[in-house]
A protein has these predicted regions:
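Acidic surface patches and DE-rich sequence motifs
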Residues: 14, 70, 109
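Glycine-rich portal/gate segments that line the openings of hydrophobic small-molecule binding cavities
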Residues: 26, 46, 55-101, 124, ...
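Hydrophobic pocket/interface hotspot
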Residues: 33-38, 44, 80, 117-119, ...
Length: 160
């Protein structure tokens, strides 16, 4: 199943901005239910295996501040600003050395009971760090992240 699931994940560079990588996957879930599931930040450690712990530090309306502790010990502070009417989850990393934001949109699939998840990840390194990290390296990391997260979403919803 892993091989066919991986084949269903499409990852490509944005036509609009060389700092954005996009991707698509179809998951087995109603789009509203899938969006609501991913909005539950506590479930991110079950959806994304590289996340060990989730701490919601603030939640107000469609905005939230969340800290993810990854299995490698890396801590990520994230600001969410979601758009429920568009079934869009948008978030930015607030503590890194790079400017990083991502969005996931949950669109009803062609077949009943499916959802197409479209994601965009922007990452750009500025300042002194930019002298040591090439654009190609950042592009590779973006591509790996988009592919991995879409695969994780697909695997999670295949089981639930």
């Amino acid at each position: 199943m892993a091989a066919s699931a991986a084949a269903d994940v499409s990852v490509y560079e944005s036509h609009d901005d060389h700092s954005i990588t996009e991707g698509d996957v179809v998951i087995v879930a109603d789009s509203d239910a899938a969006y609501d599931t991913v909005l539950d930040y506590a479930k991110w450690s079950a959806i994304f295996p590289d996340i060990k712990q989730v701490t919601v530090t603030k939640k107000q309306g469609d905005d939230a501040r969340v800290t993810f502790l990854h299995v490698d010990g890396n801590k990520e502070n994230v600001h969410f600003h979601n758009t429920p009417a568009a079934r869009m989850i948008w978030f930015e990393d607030t503590g890194g050395r790079a400017e990083v934001w991502a969005e996931m949109v949950f669109v009803p699939g062609e077949k009943s009971g499916t959802t197409r998840v479209h994601t965009r990840v922007y990452a750009s390194v500025h300042g002194v760090t930019g002298l040591f990290v090439s654009d190609d390296k950042v592009k590779t990391l973006r591509t790996q992240r988009v592919r991995s997260e879409l695969h994780d979403l697909q695997a999670y919803f295949a089981k639930h």
